[in-house]
């Protein structure tokens, strides 16, 4: 069964503003047991079949009966899809056939009340309304130390949730212990040394990101001001971190990139291929990513602005169970030049 709309418009007629919204919702009954082309439902069908759905402006009453169409008088906001129908009127008294034809479409729930007090189309206007977002506070209360229950208060905006957590749960400067009691927090009661660190941590649970990038068209937002500061350097080109090795003039936007670069000047090659039988290792993760294309794989993603030297890359291969090869420990020092493969 298909839904769509048709707008009766004769040749040379101009639709008025009211007539523009008198489009007809039709129900295609092709393939039903009531005939080759389905039941023929005229515009004048008995309103008792679908109460309240036959209220139409006077302009629509002059249109001729439509084969296979059911006039519902709903404003034309629905997607229209045309389908050929065989001609042929239907008697006004054929209400029983109409009810029988609609009996098999219980899943469509065509007899729902779409009328008063808002008139036709109120149901579809309601369905188009955006779903309101509910933010729930999951801070565990201290009313029952043995089995604490979450606060469970709901809020419609992030600002309301953050204000509630800050005022009602985190407390002011008089708070001695800076502990996160959010439900299922992985810190498990381990305190922070300062309140601002607790506030930054709570954003992991609430999803708050109060630091937007000020550059037009960027649109990125961050939970911490430090991350925003680092990000803005991608727009300004600032590189305040200079390589600490003498004779190297390389500069970087953040300290983690400088740390990754420093392996060029040492014997350390912590980025090791974990494919069984491969002994390649590199001084920089970008070199490892290029190498992994040979195997048709991708290494684990880096951790953003944090240190990219992860235990997964620095440790021996878990697949092969082998130790780092001698080549990974060999000292290759060429100042100012990237010698990674």
Swiss-Prot record:
Tissue localization of expression: Exclusively expressed in the cerebellum.
Name by which UniProt lists this protein: Zinc finger protein ZIC 4
C2H2-type zinc-finger residues: 135-169, 178-205, 211-235, 241-265, 271-295
Major location category of this protein: nucleus
Family indicated by similarity: Belongs to the GLI C2H2-type zinc-finger protein family.
GO annotations of cellular component type: nucleus
Signal peptide: none
Listed Pfam families: zf-C2H2, zf-C2H2_15, zf_ZIC
GO biological process, one term: regulation of transcription by RNA polymerase II
Key words, A-Z: DNA-binding, Metal-binding, Nucleus, Repeat, Zinc, Zinc-finger
Record's subcellular location: Nucleus
Segments of this protein annotated with the region Disordered: 36-66, 289-309
Domain of life (superkingdom): Eukaryota
Keyword Zinc-finger assigned: yes
Molecular function per GO: DNA binding; RNA polymerase II transcription regulatory region sequence-specific DNA binding; zinc ion binding
Function: Binds to DNA.
